[in-house]
């Protein structure tokens, strides 16, 4: 049977799905290059240390013939950090990319383990200018892909980082708390604060409710937290939102937004739509990533778009075509 079945999380694309996802990738890539982004292609296989200091259970690992531990890339941003640190690429610079990334999903939820992405990285430019360009190009890319209804949701990585650094948790405790926050598990968070009391107890217990219209979330958060670093992060998000008022009609915030990648250090954002349960675009600031590769800190922001999720968001609006195999939709 292994000759005709696929590994868990792998899927064939046929007919309309194959054609439209190709067109989305092509059109967004062409648009970004026309906007001055330099195309970059990075290898599918990398040394595992590019992405983590230890073996991650959700990465695909393999040994080459010399016994070196390699990984199928789980994201492209870390690879671009390696490129900046190891070559003579001059900054500031802007990159665009598209290609496959791989994540091993332990849970059998029908999730894809091979993902098609397109994205950008803006490196070395003034922070405010870079943030605005990143969000503008994200919106333009979604519009180009004909996504009709979507919402930008903002947060700031320093909020949870400040709390975690103060609590000094071991890796298991930190993972458990982040899981409670991600799932908005009020009981779990409450029990955690009872066992590990801190100055952030009230804020943590309120986190499952700190999402919705941006100004309401900001106002409520400022009522229950007095930590200077968190307040500065809230101010940073508010300033960005003011700058985006002409571009985005409505914005939301979720202060319990757990960053998709560990390297985010500042503003983070995700984009959600009505027809897709998870975010189909995510991004943020990651100024300190380059230190991982022995380079100096650089202002940096980027985003990645899940092409297959964008297809799910628009495919009901597309005309049918020949071919009836289920995975071809």
UniProtKB/Swiss-Prot annotation:
<dbReference type="GO" id="GO:0016740">
    <property type="term" value="F:transferase activity"/>
</dbReference>
<dbReference type="InterPro" id="IPR041715">
    <property type="entry name" value="HisRS-like_core"/>
</dbReference>
<dbReference type="InterPro" id="IPR004517">
    <property type="entry name" value="HisZ"/>
</dbReference>
<protein>
    <recommendedName>
        <fullName>ATP phosphoribosyltransferase regulatory subunit</fullName>
    </recommendedName>
</protein>
<dbReference type="Pfam" id="PF13393">
    <property type="entry name" value="tRNA-synt_His"/>
</dbReference>
<dbReference type="InterPro" id="IPR045864">
    <property type="entry name" value="aa-tRNA-synth_II/BPL/LPL"/>
</dbReference>
<keyword id="KW-0368">Histidine biosynthesis</keyword>
<keyword id="KW-0028">Amino-acid biosynthesis</keyword>
<dbReference type="GO" id="GO:0140096">
    <property type="term" value="F:catalytic activity, acting on a protein"/>
</dbReference>
<comment type="similarity">
    <text>Belongs to the class-II aminoacyl-tRNA synthetase family. HisZ subfamily.</text>
</comment>
<comment type="pathway">
    <text>Amino-acid biosynthesis; L-histidine biosynthesis; L-histidine from 5-phospho-alpha-D-ribose 1-diphosphate: step 1/9.</text>
</comment>
<keyword id="KW-0963">Cytoplasm</keyword>
<dbReference type="GO" id="GO:0000105">
    <property type="term" value="P:L-histidine biosynthetic process"/>
</dbReference>
<dbReference type="InterPro" id="IPR004516">
    <property type="entry name" value="HisRS/HisZ"/>
</dbReference>
<dbReference type="GO" id="GO:0005737">
    <property type="term" value="C:cytoplasm"/>
</dbReference>
<dbReference type="GO" id="GO:0006427">
    <property type="term" value="P:histidyl-tRNA aminoacylation"/>
</dbReference>
<comment type="subunit">
    <text>Heteromultimer composed of HisG and HisZ subunits.</text>
</comment>
<dbReference type="GO" id="GO:0004821">
    <property type="term" value="F:histidine-tRNA ligase activity"/>
</dbReference>
<comment type="function">
    <text>Required for the first step of histidine biosynthesis. May allow the feedback regulation of ATP phosphoribosyltransferase activity by histidine.</text>
</comment>
